[in-house]
Structures are given as C-alpha cells and as structure tokens.
C-alpha cells in the first residue's frame, strides 16, 4: 500500500490549493474526493464565472467581515488577495477585476479555474482517490 506525506479530504478549492502547495514542496499527497468530481462547487461560484477573490488589501477584506474578523487575520496575513491572484496567474489563468473589485477569470468560466487547479495538482504529483475506493486510514508504525 502506498503511503503519503499528506492526505487531504475533499477536492474543492481549499483542498486542491493545499495539495498544490504541498506538492510544490516535494511532498507526496493524496486528495480523497467523495463526489468523483474535482472542484464541483467551484463550478457554480459567481454564477458559473468563479469569483476568485477581491482585488483589495487584506486590511480591506478584514474591515468588511461583519463578525469575528480576527479569525481570518492569520490566513489573510499569510496569503492576501494579491497572492491569490498571483497564484492563479502563475497557473496560466488570466484574471480581470470588475465592479466592486471582484476578480474573475477573463474567460468568465469557472471551468478554467478548476482545470488549472487539477492540472497543477497532477503536475506536482498529487494523486486523486475516489472515496468509494478508500477504506480506512492505518496508523503509522
């Protein structure tokens, strides 16, 4: 049985982003997805256009979070909206900013975001595992 440095539950935006980051750092990664479709929920964000982020500072994002904005501070201080945009542009996705500073792929198609994430995962050696094939984790010896 193959062992991985990391096993991620869910091939959504966060799961695939995390998998790519780990893969780029030379870690062996498996992503377990129960629906058999990577990025399924991403396909419907922004009415199928995928609102990637907002083109503003992390401080502006924090000011617009109605409750418990301190919860987001740690994440935003490490990976701000401009980092999100750079990440997707690095993957070859052209982005545009629309009214309200909302950022979308130039194609206006969420599929391009999903394809870029899946390709980045595959290129960095991430293995996708269908949940139906997965039985249970085993503790390390």
Regions picked out by a protein language model, each given a short descriptive name:
Residues 6-30:
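N-terminal Rossmann-like FAD-binding beta1-loop-alpha1 element of flavoenzymes
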Residues 24-42:
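Glycine-rich FAD pyrophosphate-binding loop
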Residues 49-95:
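Glycine-rich active-site loop/strand segments that organize a redox cofactor
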Residues 73-79, 101-118:
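Short beta-strand to alpha-helix junction loop
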Residues 124-132:
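A conserved beta-strand/loop element that lines the FAD pocket in flavoprotein oxidoreductases
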Residues 134-141:
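Conserved small/polar residues in nucleotide/adenosyl-binding loops
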